Amino acid sequence: MPGNDGVLAGKRGLIMGVANDRSIAWGIAKACAEAGAELAFTYQGEAFGKRLEPLAQSVGSDVMLDVDVTDDASLDAAFSALQERWDRLDFLVHAIAYSDKSELTGRFLNTSRANFANSMDISAYSLIEVARRAHPMMVEHGGTVLTLTYLGSSRVTPNYNVMGVAKAALESAVRYLASDLGPEGIRVNAISPGPMKTLAASAIGGVRRTYRHTETNAPLRSNATLEAVGGTAVYLCSDAGSCTSGEIIHVDGGFHVLGMPNIENL
């Protein structure tokens, strides 16, 4: 990233949630690597491991850990393996979310109990679990925990449904963790990108219309890019972000400030 050369040199970061080279997590990983960070990655299952391996190798990483964030034993094993390789962790990127695709369309009223619980567990509660396990590797020197959210957490977004509720919980967890961990020099923040063409976003009904609507109406007339989100992550994980914690940073072309669409487009 221009202007970011070396700002993360000497820092080690764990990236959780890279699905492919269009993932927001990958945009963050690439930017952090270009800024000098040494990276480790997690994935879930053999198929995602095969996708991740060439990406990890391209940024010089040979640390890949298979983990299921709904399984305590799996989390324990992954972080134990990481501690065997590294004696410290400077930043952790949590880019993990899931909801049943069949419930990311239609009425929120029809959300099932099972999918509500599963969406909250994977998309929100998992941040607490990974922060707890990262804590021993950060407590002596401080660090950064970073997650990803979306405007649907605070405003009704078509078809986002239970994910909006899960992201609202995630953002609240960011604030509580920031308060809890701040005295030990550990910062906790979230980036809220606008809609992006990722594997996760493709599961949401009508998402192409959402892309067009955001690009047409955002003050900057643009959607977020991997480069923009990556650059923001580098700032938050670097010493330049040393006094920023508990924040939700919007990277959405300014769309979040709007009260209504551009009237010229109505």
Predicted region positions:
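Hydrophobic structural elements of the Rossmann-like NAD(P)H-binding subdomain
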Residues: 15, 93, 146, 188-191, ...
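A glycine/serine/threonine-rich, flexible loop-to-helix segment
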Residues: 53, 162, 183, 193-218, ...
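C-terminal helical subdomain
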Residues: 125, 183, 190-193, 209-244, ...
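Canonical Rossmann dinucleotide-binding motif of NAD(H)/NADP(H)-dependent dehydrogenases/reductases
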Residues: 5-41
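Conserved glycine-rich Rossmann-like NAD(P)H-binding loop of the short-chain dehydrogenase/reductase
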Residues: 37-52
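Catalytic loop of short-chain dehydrogenase/reductase
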Residues: 17-24, 97-128, 132, 139-183, ...
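Conserved mid-core segment of classical short-chain dehydrogenase/reductases
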Residues: 65-76, 80-85, 94-117, 136, ...
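A short hydrophobic alpha-helix cap/turn motif
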Residues: 33, 87, 138-140, 179-184, ...
